[in-house]
């Protein structure tokens, strides 16, 4: 039986995927090429991370002409908010 929560935790365990998720959240949507231009990784690496995030139900792909744009799902947006809140909490504790 699939473990959806385990898939989400596995996807979010990688700092690069958390960065991809945050970038999409800020912009509303992004292509793999746009993400590769702002992150220190290749387009192929970004595509692999996007596939993992999509498999976990955090992002969805939408074909627009020759490009595929990725946006957060409702679940992805909720997890992004939770991660932001956790980061603020941890920064407050260390300062």
Q: What annotation goes with each model-predicted range?
A:
Residues 22, 47-51:
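Base-recognition residues in the alpha-helical recognition helix of bacterial helix-turn-helix
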Residues 45-47, 81:
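Generic cytosolic/nucleocytoplasmic N-terminal low-complexity/intrinsically disordered segments
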Residues 79-95:
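A conserved amphipathic terminal alpha-helix motif
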Residues 3-42, 64-77:
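N-terminal helix-turn-helix DNA-binding core of bacterial DNA-binding proteins
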Residues 37, 54-55:
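Alpha-helical residues within the helix-turn-helix
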Residues 1-7, 90-95:
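Actinobacteria-biased recognition of intrinsically disordered, low-complexity terminal regions
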């Amino acid at each position: 039986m699939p473990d959806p929560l385990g898939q989400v935790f596995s996807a979010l365990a990688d700092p690069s995927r958390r960065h991809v998720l945050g970038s999409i959240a800020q912009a509303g949507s992004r292509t793999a090429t746009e993400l590769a231009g702002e992150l220190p990784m290749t387009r192929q690496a970004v595509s692999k991370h996007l596939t993992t995030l999509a498999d976990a139900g955090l992002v969805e792909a939408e074909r627009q002409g020759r490009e595929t744009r990725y946006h957060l799902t409702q679940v992805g947006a909720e997890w992004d908010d939770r991660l932001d809140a956790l980061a603020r909490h941890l920064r407050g504790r260390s300062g």
